[in-house]
Amino acid sequence: MADSEDTSVILQGIDTINSVEGLEEDGYLSDEDTSLSNELADAQRQWEESLQQLNKLLNWVLLPLLGKYIGRRMAKTLWSRFIEHFV
């Protein structure tokens, strides 16, 4: 699933680069427009990398800790009910 998302992002980036190159060849973009589009593309890439890092943090750190906490709490509750019932 992540591979298809990465592939689509790469293809979108290639399409953007191709469209910018086509405009440069036609003389529609100046150097300022090109540098601005490059800066925007870099900012977009950094934003996507940040989102991926946050996603990994959530999936690999926070969710397991939350599951561990909830699991221990549930086990304590069930064990106390079990003991009360049989003791």
From Swiss-Prot:
Mitochondrial intermembrane side of membrane: 72-87
Major location category of this protein: mitochondrion
Keywords: Membrane, Mitochondrion, Mitochondrion outer membrane, Protein transport, Transmembrane, Transmembrane helix, Transport
GO process terms (BP): mitochondrial outer membrane translocase complex assembly; protein insertion into mitochondrial outer membrane
One term under GO cellular component: mitochondrial outer membrane
Consequences of knocking out this gene: Causes severe growth phenotype and leads to reduced biogenesis of mitochondrial proteins and abnormal mitochondrial morphology. Compromises import of multispan mitochondrial outer membrane (MOM) proteins.
Keyword Signal: no
Membrane-crossing residue ranges in chain numbering: 54-71
Places the protein is found: Mitochondrion outer membrane
Classification via Pfam families: Mim2
Side of membrane Cytoplasmic, spans: 1-53
Recorded topology in the membrane: Single-pass membrane protein
Function: Component of the MIM complex required for outer membrane protein import. Involved in import of the subset of proteins with multiple alpha-helical transmembrane segments, including UGO1, TOM20 and FZO1.
Protein family: Belongs to the MIM2 family.
Subunit structure: Component of the MIM complex containing at least MIM1 and MIM2. Interacts with MIM1; interaction is direct.
Protein name: Mitochondrial import protein 2
Organism: Saccharomyces cerevisiae (strain ATCC 204508 / S288c) (Baker's yeast)
Name of the gene: MIM2
